[in-house]
């Protein structure tokens, strides 16, 4: 074992001790043939029984089927691969990695098993495509770039919701389909993916694409403009930052190089679109976020809070839902107070409490195709200086001026932009940014 490897294992011991071919269908014109896309181009589940309320009536019926020629498959990085990459410079053997994971309370065999399940399902997807004469490129996060997206007629995200968000982040062409396949249904919810039955029967999904037996779901996304003084439009990949600080340092160096500029820069359209949400707040969660906010070009309001979340209909069942949802305990307490204050003879049984709770929580969800933003203020501070007139509200445009010291603006949990004092972010929905996805029946 090298000295560095020994140092890593030794450090963990001390911590542990302290704690105890071308893609073409029938009639395609060859490898270079472009896809025939159905549909009219307008317009964190699926049609059929048990379909969530927020997707009821969504999507446009495909017309003529969908036959792409080239597909890029974006495969997620499994936890096993992530741990290998974290310690790649230490040159750990598999046995060393096993010991290191055990010291951290993680199961090496469990991670390896999930990795094999994911890998097997990715191979199933690729084999299914190639059996149809499809030209396929398999890429990981680091290899997934704009050139790869331009090459492909369609993008398949092989993983879970996080992989779907990654795959969508590079696709700015509203006509290019992005399809999610859950490669580990036992461990991943996969709200944005095809129904789990297609994980092991992907050829059936392909045949439905060919026959047009699906609907297009046009998911709205948030576009972001950044302007003001000392802004840094260089994005930081938070996944890569976990593995290495090099990228983050490069972004900081670029920021420092421009830090001396006092003049304000005009609005810059950022090269990402938010499919789920945008979060704005101090990097240190224990520090209050100070900012000014304007909704739909209204007056500016100074606020302090734990940050704010701006989501789409797609993201309304993700982080935003968990920020705003209420528990049955809170509903029961409120109803009891209302009963006492209003002298109501309301039968407060468990059935009523759960019904009220569910109806309120379901009201937080809306269709991914609706062109509106739901912004939520997290834990707003209310005193004689600061207030929040609206803790949650639908809007078409939100502008935020930072008064923070070390804040960030995070898009879909994966891409971060510095957002400090003087920076102004404008967020809105534009039809050109909608993402073309697929709805298949269960």
From Swiss-Prot:
One of its GO terms (cellular component) is mitochondrion. Residues 1-62 form a transit peptide. Residues 24-60 are annotated as: Disordered. The modification N6-succinyllysine is found at residues 76, 302, 317. One of its GO terms (biological process) is NAD metabolic process. It catalyses: NAD(+) + ATP = ADP + NADP(+) + H(+). Belongs to the NAD kinase family. This is NAD kinase 2, mitochondrial. It comes from Homo sapiens. The lineage of its organism: Eukaryota, Metazoa, Chordata, Craniata, Vertebrata.
């Amino acid at each position: 074992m090298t000295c560095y490897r020994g140092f890593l294992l030794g450090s963990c011991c001390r911590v542990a001790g302290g704690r105890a071919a071308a893609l073409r269908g029938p009639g395609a014109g060859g490898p270079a043939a472009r896809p025939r896309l159905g549909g009219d181009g307008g317009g964190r589940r699926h049609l059929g029984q048990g379909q969530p309320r927020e997707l009821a009536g969504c999507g446009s019926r495909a017309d003529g089927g969908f036959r792409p020629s080239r597909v890029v498959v974006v495969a997620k990085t499994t936890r096993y691969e992530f741990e290998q990459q974290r310690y790649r410079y230490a040159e750990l053997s598999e046995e060393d990695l096993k010991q290191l994971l055990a010291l951290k309370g993680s199961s090496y065999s469990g991670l390896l098993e999930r990795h094999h399940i994911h890998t097997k399902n990715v191979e199933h997807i690729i084999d299914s495509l190639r059996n149809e004469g499809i030209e396929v490129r398999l890429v990981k996060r680091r290899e997934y770039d704009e050139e790869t997206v331009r090459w492909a007629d369609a993008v398949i995200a092989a993983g879970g919701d996080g992989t779907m968000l990654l795959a969508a982040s590079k696709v700015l062409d509203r006509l290019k389909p992005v399809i999610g396949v859950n490669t580990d249904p036992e461990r991943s919810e996969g709200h944005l993916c095809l129904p789990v039955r297609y994980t092991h029967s992907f050829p059936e999904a392909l045949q439905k694409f060919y026959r047009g037996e699906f609907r297009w779901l046009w998911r709205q996304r948030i576009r972001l403009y950044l302007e003001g003084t000392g802004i840094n439009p260089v994005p930081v990949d938070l996944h890569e930052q976990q593995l290495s600080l090099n990228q983050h340092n490069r972004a900081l160096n670029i920021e420092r190089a421009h830090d001396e500029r006092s003049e304000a820069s005009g609005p810059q359209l950022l090269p990402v679109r938010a499919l789920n949400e945008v979060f704005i707040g101090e990097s240190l969660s224990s520090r209050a976020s100070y900012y000014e906010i304007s909704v739909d070009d209204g007056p500016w309001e100074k606020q302090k809070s734990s940050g704010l979340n701006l989501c789409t209909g797609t993201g309304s069942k993700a982080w935003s839902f968990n920020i705003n949802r209420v528990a049955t305990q809170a509903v029961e307490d409120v109803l009891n107070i209302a009963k006492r204050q209003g002298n109501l003879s309301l039968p407060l049984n468990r059935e009523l409490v759960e019904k009220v709770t569910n109806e309120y929580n379901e009201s937080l969800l809306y269709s991914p195709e609706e062109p509106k933003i739901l912004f939520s203020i997290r834990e707003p501070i209310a005193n004689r200086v600061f207030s929040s007139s609206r803790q949650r509200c639908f809007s078409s445009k939100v502008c935020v001026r930072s008064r923070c010291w070390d804040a960030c603006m995070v898009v879909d949990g994966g891409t971060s932009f510095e957002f400090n004092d003087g920076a102004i972010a404008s967020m809105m929905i534009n039809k050109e940014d909608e993402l073309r996805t697929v709805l298949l029946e269960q």
